[in-house]
Amino acid sequence: MKVVAFNGSPKKEGNTYQAIKMVTDELEKEGIEVEIVHVGNKTIRGCMACNGCARNQDKKCVMSNDDVNEWIAKMDEADGIILGSPVHFSAIGGTMKSFLDRAFYVGSSNGGMYRHKVGAASITASNIKCSI
């Protein structure tokens, strides 16, 4: 069994990573192969809703100048998927959102690629007050 975990935090080993790591450590104890992918420090364009993935039916986004297609392939090959993100301004991080929009569009356009996978999410938040 293989699980891929995506860290949507810009901080490589911040709180989101620590939460994901707690889960993946337990999975590894059970003999499950685990890979953590750091998404949050990348530049990812959002989905353009061009329908190219639906037309091509190749399990890829037509935008190929970033790591998203590699990550989609990892999700397709995995038995389980963990998504981790900090909360920024009441939502998941922008990079993670862009990645997920594209991955889910590709997945739903290619026969529901992730339909029978085990999934989990980890959201981290802080109570730091800031004035804007």
Where do the language-model regions lie?
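Short, glycine-/small-residue-rich phosphate/pyrophosphate-handling segment
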Residues: G94-T95, S108-I132
